[in-house]
Amino acid sequence: MAMAIDGYECTVCGDCKPVCPTGSIVLQGGIYVIDADSCNECADLGEPRCLGVCPVDFCIQPLDD
């Protein structure tokens, strides 16, 4: 599973990008997106790091298949 950023909720603060251990978060077309192929939800860290730093509730959520 991977995480996803809601483009409508994201404030483009950039807090998530530097904490992503897989480098899956990139700025694309003026919004941050998470590469689902490389995101592993920080499996070995207990919880996704992006969730811990995002100032907006429900901006980053598990990607629906």
UniProtKB/Swiss-Prot annotation:
Pfam families: Fer4_7 (PF12838). The keyword tRNA-binding does not apply. Its cofactor is [4Fe-4S] cluster. One of its GO terms (biological process) is nitrogen fixation. [4Fe-4S] cluster 2 binds at C20, C39, C42, C50. Binds 2 [4Fe-4S] clusters. One of its GO terms (molecular function) is metal ion binding. Gene3D superfamilies: 3.30.70.20. This is Ferredoxin-like protein in vnf region. It comes from Azotobacter chroococcum mcd 1. The lineage of its organism: Bacteria, Pseudomonadati, Pseudomonadota, Gammaproteobacteria, Pseudomonadales.
